[in-house]
A protein has these predicted regions:
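Metal-ion/cofactor- or nucleotide/acyl-coenzyme-handling active-site neighborhoods
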Residues: 1-168
Length: 168
């Protein structure tokens, strides 16, 4: 089994002994340094494994790592990213987001969106972070094309419009 771990996780020694003695698990460390700039420069950095498009969520580095593997096609399933209808703003200007996940859809509730300083985030900040994530998919699509590879989104109703769509 191959186990991909971001380099920053190496600081936490707690999980490492669990894997160290298992000969069936191969550990791959990847760099999540956000890379921006001219596409050709970014492609060179991505190929070297020195960084990824701004990794706003786990899917972005996952696709980047997949493109470094010997597969010609990568299929995305369960990547709906349909966050926009989940956002509301209260009459007190508090931004709420109902983040549903497959493992807690019946229990999740709308909650205040917090910034790193734990203050309530403004709507423009939330939308900007979404912009960054969606833009990263277009950067990955261009990189995939340059490699002669293809990322295919098989998620019905997905908001990710950067990749070719296909129904299963």
């Amino acid at each position: 089994m191959n186990f991909f771990v971001p380099a920053r996780a190496l600081k936490d020694k707690e999980w490492q002994p669990l894997l160290a003695g298992n000969p069936h698990i191969k550990l791959y460390i990847y760099n999540t340094t956000p890379i921006e700039g001219f596409q050709s420069f970014c492609n060179w950095i991505f190929r070297k494994g020195w960084g990824v498009p701004r990794p706003h969520n786990v899917l972005i580095p996952s696709i980047a790592m997949g493109l470094r593997l010997p597969f010609r096609k990568i299929y995305l399933a369960g990547a709906d990213h349909s966050w926009l209808p989940e956002i509301t703003v209260t009459d007190d200007n508090v931004v709420l987001m109902h983040q549903k996940h497959f493992y807690d859809q019946n229990k999740s509730q709308a909650d205040t969106v917090k910034q790193e300083n734990l203050n309530s985030a403004r709507l423009y900040t939330v939308l900007y972070h979404m912009y960054v994530a969606f833009k990263s998919y277009f950067i990955l699509e261009a990189y995939a094309r340059k490699l002669g590879k293809e990322v295919i989104n098989v998620t019905p109703g997905s908001y990710i419009d950067a990749f070719k769509r296909m129904k299963l």
